[in-house]
Every structure is written in C-alpha cells, then in structure tokens.
Design a protein with these regions (language model features):
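Non-catalytic alpha-helical scaffolds and adjoining flexible linkers that form interface surfaces
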Residues: 1-20, 25-250
Length: 250
C-alpha cells in the first residue's frame, strides 16, 4: 500500500553507495525514517526533494519494516538559506532540535509548523536571525513539555519579578530566592518578559510580530538558548558551528 505524505527533511544519512536514509517530520505521522533508493546516483530525480531542509511530498511504501520512497517532488527548498552559510547552519540547528523533540508515529503538527515558519523567515523575511532563533528555541521548549511560567513571581506573586530560574522555568524576585536553592537565575527586564509571553502564547503565523528594545532583545536571545539547552539537558553540534560562524564575523 502506498502512503503520500508531506514532510520536512531533518537529517540525511548515507546508507550505501547508492541509497540514503532520511529522517523526516510530518504533520500526521510525526517523525519517520524513509529510505531513498538511488538518491546518491548522479542525476537522480530524488536529489532535490531529499536534501536536508527540503519540504516535499513523498509517496512511500512499506517493505521489510521500512518506508521506501516511490516518488517525490519538492514543495519548498528554502533557497535563501542555501545561499548563506550562516543561515543554513542555523536552519540545521532547528532541524536537529526538531528531530530530538519529535517522536516516531506521534503527530506533532505544531512542531512542523514552527520549524517551517522559522525556516521561511530565515530564507525570505526581513527578520533578524537572532530573533528567529530565540522564537524557535522558546516555542520548541514549550512543545517539548517545558512551557515556562511567565506571569509574576512564583513565590510572592509580584507582577514585575527581575529573575528567571532556568531549571524551574519560572520568574522570581531577588528577595524571594532561597539561599540554598540550586540552579542558575538570569536577570530579566519587563520588555524581555513581555516578549517571552508573546512568543509562548501567540499564533505561530504571527511569531515575529512583536516589538522589543535592544537591551531586552539581547537578554531574550541569551535566555531562550540557555533555557532550551538546560531543559533538554544537552548541547547541539549544529548550534556550536553556528556560533563559531558568528564569532568569526565579529
């Protein structure tokens, strides 16, 4: 039986000298592994739709417990990413996070929409890279089950707390912190909290429709990254590479 899916390619792994295995994210089936036969051959029609960060339509069939591509065509290649190494490296970081957060055979349309919207923003919209990155990281943390509590100090209810507990994912006042508490706290400005509240709660299609001052933006960029890696308890090689490119350009 044939199955037609629309999917984003998150990872490409060589299988042999002719074939490759694709890790893809779908709307209705979650994360899947599919085999692309002959994709490594010269002039294969599967090259474009099967490349990393390609969004395409795939017709697959199941054989010996594995999905294999029968035919495929591209829906969006995000060419704006492929002409810019820095943007491409950030896109691959998004893909690595999405692969970790998603699960086999568990639908996650919100994660697919988030990743596609952020790739589109990098490729075609006039949105700062760091803003796209922070919005993706914070929203991905929510989809992974780590939605932060962003409405007042968790201890006293003060509406304007000035610290964010990275491990607990909540706001607090300096005076409410227990002297023997563990975890790292980062300072937050009201503008930073407002932006975080917007990112966590907005429609994905309007993810970048907010204003933020320069100092609050710098806080947001650092906090979103640190919060995601703290909650997922791991680093990302793609993130390290992206940051090395930024350092080289400074």
């Amino acid at each position: 039986m044939y199955l037609t899916i629309q999917a984003l390619v998150l990872r490409v792994t060589d299988y042999n000298d002719r074939d490759a295995l694709l890790t893809v994210l779908t709307r209705n089936y979650g994360k899947l592994t599919i085999k692309a036969r002959g994709v490594r051959r010269k002039n294969s029609p599967l090259v474009a739709p099967c490349q990393l960060l390609s969004y395409g339509e795939f017709t697959v069939f199941e054989y010996r417990g594995m999905y294999t591509i029968n035919e495929a065509h591209s829906l969006e290649l995000f060419q704006g990413l492929r002409r810019d190494l820095q943007k491409l490296s950030l896109g691959t970081y998004f893909a690595q996070v999405a692969e970790l957060v998603s699960q086999e055979d568990l639908p996650n349309p919100e994660l697919l929409a988030l990743t596609l919207n952020c790739l589109y923003a990098l490729a075609k919209l006039d949105v700062p890279e760091q803003m796209v990155k922070a919005a993706f990281e914070l929203r991905a943390a929510c989809l992974a089950g780590y939605t932060p509590d962003l409405y007042g100090c968790h201890a006293c209810g003060c509406p304007n707390p000035d610290r964010f507990d990275l491990a607990a994912g909540r706001l607090e006042c300096m005076t409410c912190r227990s002297v023997d508490s563990d975890g790292i706290r980062m300072p937050v400005l009201p503008g930073t909290v407002d932006a975080m509240q917007y990112i966590v709660g907005c429609d994905t299609k309007r993810l970048f429709s907010f204003q933020i001052g320069d100092e609050s933006a710098r806080q947001l960029y650092q906090l979103a990254e640190t919060y995601l890696v703290t909650q997922l308890e791991r680093g990302f090689s793609t993130l390290d590479f992206y940051k090395s490119l930024i350092v080289d350009l400074v």
